[in-house]
Amino acid sequence: MSNNSFDDKSIDKLKAYVYALFDPLEDRPFYIGKGRGNRVFQHVEGAILEDKESNKYETIREIRSRNSNNRVKHTIVRHGMSDEVAFEVESALIDLANSTGANLTNEVTGHNSIEIGIMNADEIIQKYNAQPLNELLHSVVIININKKYKAIKDGALKNNTKYPG
């Protein structure tokens, strides 16, 4: 048995799973994903074999460069799921991690995170009680800010996107 792959019996029992990659020195996740089979181990392999630049690969390369004993820690958070359930669990964990200031290297936030992802009570009320905009009375510019941006203090988003004139 190897620490960079699962045996066939384990793969059969895992089904779809959600995993986290940890920096062993910081003991906090830097990546959360959904997979089957040996997917959890493929990121380290990709960082070694590919020239692709990404925050995830850079983090893995940095961990590996410290010394041979520093390895990415692979943690299965939940397993034995269908793909559909695993996507929901993955999205919920990414949302929670991002809302607590974790420095995840995920390039996307997960399935349906914009529509049904993490929201406070006021945001839920606003979402489901918003009145439809039937007509525009003035010229407008619409800026779509998705949840990929880092959380900022109240008012800062408005101040940074309003017209200066």
Locate each region found by the language model.
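Structure-specific nucleic-acid interaction/processing domains
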Residues: 2-150
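Structured alpha/beta reader/binder surfaces that contact nucleic acids or chromatin modification marks
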Residues: 155-165
